[in-house]
């Protein structure tokens, strides 16, 4: 079954290069503040939840493959990196800060308006992009803040409207958590209300199915 994807976007203020640098610096500062954050109660961390289970290889999205040709380092899988993030209050603060700031600052536009293309994956470094571009930029900033790329996987879902959408899954010791441009809340995957289709593999450059017999043609532009 193939799934059509929405082209709707909500416009937000543009993100400048200076702000991008500021976001990376903010993440580093939050990590440097770890001793103070560690003094916070454990309740500051998300509750324990179950992780998603992959069921086998899945077909990559063509636009993702093209993105990997342009940005091979963004898709590379380093198996010496941790496969899971051990959350601390400081890391949790960094994750939430990056998610909120990118959601607030990037202007959501369709690939047609942005690139004159049906589907294109890119980093929203010019301050414009659709859902996957938001998540790819968040991942880059989180990597710069010290989190392992291998534990942050681009993920295709079906949203509450039955439309395709792209989110970023963080695989952690407290379960799989989702960063999404449609909400500032970082939620356990089962609490998103989405149907999870597939995500990037942690073992090689490719994709793994998450239990639904569906192969979206593009990532959602939401």
Predicted segments with their positions:
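N-terminal secretory signal peptides that target proteins for export/translocation
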Residues: 1-15
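A structural boundary/capping signal
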Residues: 2-5, 36-222
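Hydrophobic alpha-helical segments and their boundary regions
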Residues: 11, 16-17, 61, 127
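Bacterial N-terminal signal peptides
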Residues: 14-32
């Amino acid at each position: 079954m193939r799934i059509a994807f929405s082209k709707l976007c909500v416009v937000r203020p543009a993100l400048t290069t200076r702000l991008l640098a500021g976001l990376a610096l903010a993440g580093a500062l939050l990590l440097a503040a770890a001793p103070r954050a560690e003094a916070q109660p454990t309740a500051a961390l998300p509750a324990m939840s179950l992780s998603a289970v992959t069921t086998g290889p899945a077909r990559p999205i063509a636009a993702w493959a093209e993105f990997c040709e342009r940005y091979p380092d963004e898709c590379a899988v380093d198996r010496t990196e941790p496969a899971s993030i051990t959350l601390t209050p400081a890391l949790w603060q960094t994750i939430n800060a990056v998610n909120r700031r990118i959601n607030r600052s990037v202007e959501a536009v369709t690939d047609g308006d942005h690139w004159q293309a049906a589907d294109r994956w890119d980093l929203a470094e010019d301050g414009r992009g659709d859902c996957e571009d938001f998540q790819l930029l968040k991942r880059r900033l989180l990597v710069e803040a010290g989190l392992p790329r291998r534990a942050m996987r681009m993920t295709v879902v079906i949203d509450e409207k039955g439309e395709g959408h792209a989110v970023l899954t963080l695989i952690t010791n407290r379960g799989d958590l989702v960063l999404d441009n449609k909400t500032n809340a970082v939620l356990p995957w089962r609490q998103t209300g989405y149907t999870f289709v597939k995500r990037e593999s942690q073992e090689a450059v490719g994709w793994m199915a998450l239990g639904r017999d569906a192969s979206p043609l593009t990532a959602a532009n939401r």
